[in-house]
Amino acid sequence: MRKYVLYLALLAGLLTGCYNEEDSREHVLKVYNWADYIGEGVLEDFQQYYKEQTGEEIRIVYQTFDINEIMLTKIEKGHEDFDVVCPSEYIIERMLRKDLLLPIDTVFAHSPNYMNGVAPYIREQIDKLGTPDNPASRYAVCYMWGTAGLLYNRAYVSESDLKSWGCLWDKRFAGKILMKDAYRDAYGMALLYARRRDLAEGRVTVPELMNDYSPASMDSVEKYLKLLKPNVAGWEADFGKEMMTKGKAWMNMTWSGDAQWAIEEARTVGVSWPIPFPKKAATSGMTDG
């Protein structure tokens, strides 16, 4: 699970490609999603719902990914013709610029248009990914929302150690930290720490830094990530929560959904999640659609 569930919606992206299996392509729904994002039984329920609405049967081909950039590369190269995908907001923005998406069909059988019920704030956040003439809400709506922060084991780390992202560079934690293998999260965390004084003095904002890919900023990120290397036990996309529950790592820069899973599974080893992370250290919220 990548993030904590706060909102429910859908992104519909019909991509070009070929389909060579026996089923007629129009009766196959191909979904590309994060692991743990759809509960057991939902796919079967949807097949039944679809038949009730249309009188036709549909087969679902469901695949998962754990890194946004891998998902995007697979789609860009035309290896698959997915109907529904669930990338993070910055990938939605790229896909829209590259004309990889089609507008959501809001007229389906006897179903109401649920997009009319999307909260104005959420629609506004999605539309920021597009342009006034081509708002992203035509192509995407929010499905998951969450943050990145630090999961820690209280047997080895105290909450007072976690005043800022600087704790990740503390030599006491050499070889005991797991980092999320997600480019944007690692990049953003390192840049927020590198520019912490500018943030504190109001010369720059978190959203500005999270989208700053200037040569100077990339150099700063490279410098701080290299300095972090001695403390990193590994880079993980999904196994970090399990290593934390087993006490094999002391800290994990992770997504709030993974952290919540670990808390529920491993209270006996003292895993704790500081929510919210101190404002001066927190990354901006993340949205998957």
Describe the role of every protein-language-model region:
Residues 19-98:
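Early extracytoplasmic/lumenal segment of secretory-pathway proteins
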Residues 149-156, 192, 287-289:
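A bilobed periplasmic-binding-protein/Venus flytrap-type ligand-binding module shared by bacterial periplasmic
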Residues 72, 93-145, 159-163:
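Hinge/lid segment of periplasmic solute-binding proteins
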